[in-house]
Amino acid sequence: MSMQIIDPHVHFFNLVEGQYTWLQGENPPAWPNLEKIKKPISAEQLVGSTDFELTGIVHIEAGFDNQSPINELNWLSSHLKNLPFKAVSYNQIDSPTDQFKSALNAQTHPSLCGIRDITEGTDAKRLLSANSFKNLAVLSNNQLHFEAQFNIENSDITKQVAYYAKQLPQLQIIINHAGLPSDLATWQQGV
C-alpha cells in the first residue's frame, strides 16, 4: 500500500471559462514550462501521476476570475467530483474591511478554507496597510487561513507578517512557494 498524502498546493486551470489575464494576457511570464501549465489536467490524471495515494488536495487560486472568485469555487466543485478538496480563493487583503467582508461573504462555499492575495515585489507594501491587519482578523474570526505570497527576503514585510501572526495567534498563515527565495543568505535571515 502506498503512502497517503494530501497535496496542499495545487492549481487546476480552465483556460476556456477562466480569465487568467496573467497567463493568457499580453505579457505572460517567461517561464520555460508555460505550455505545460496551460494544458488542462483532470483530477483523475493528477491521481494517476503519482505513486502516492492522493486522498485530497488544496486548490490555490490562480486568477480564474478575481472579480467574482465564487466562479472558480463552483467550477472546482464540478471538476473535482471524485476527489476530496478544499480551496483557497482570492480576496484583496488591503481592501477596506467592509469591502473585504462583502467579498468574503460572496465566496461562501463548503470548500473555502482560506484566502490568497499575491503580494510579490512592490505589491508587498500592501501588507503594511492597516486594512491588511483588520482583514486578517476577519479571516481569523471566520477560521480561514491566509496564504501569504511575498518575498521573505523583504525584511520589512517579513517583520510585519510576523507581527500579525503574534497579534492574531489563532490565524493560520501559510507562506507560499517557500517565500520565493532568490538570495539564500537573505532568505535564511527572513525565515
Segments the model singles out, each with a brief description of its role:
Residues 63-70, 91-99, 122-128, 151-158, ...:
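Acidic-and-aromatic substrate-binding clefts and catalytic sites of carbohydrate-active enzymes
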Residues 77-80, 108, 165-166:
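N-terminal cationic-hydrophobic initiation segments that often serve targeting/anchoring roles
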Residues 6-10, 56-60, 85-89, 113-117, ...:
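Hydrophobic faces of well-ordered beta-strands that scaffold small-molecule active sites
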Residues 128-191:
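Catalytic pocket-lining loop regions of alpha/beta-barrel enzymes
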Residues 95-147:
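Hydrophobic alpha-helical segments and helix pairs
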Residues 1-82:
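An N-terminally biased module of ancient metal coordination in phosphate/nucleic-acid-related enzymes
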Residues 40-49, 68-76, 95-107, 130-132, ...:
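Short, acidic/polar
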Residues 53, 83, 108-111, 169:
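Short loop/turn motifs at secondary-structure junctions
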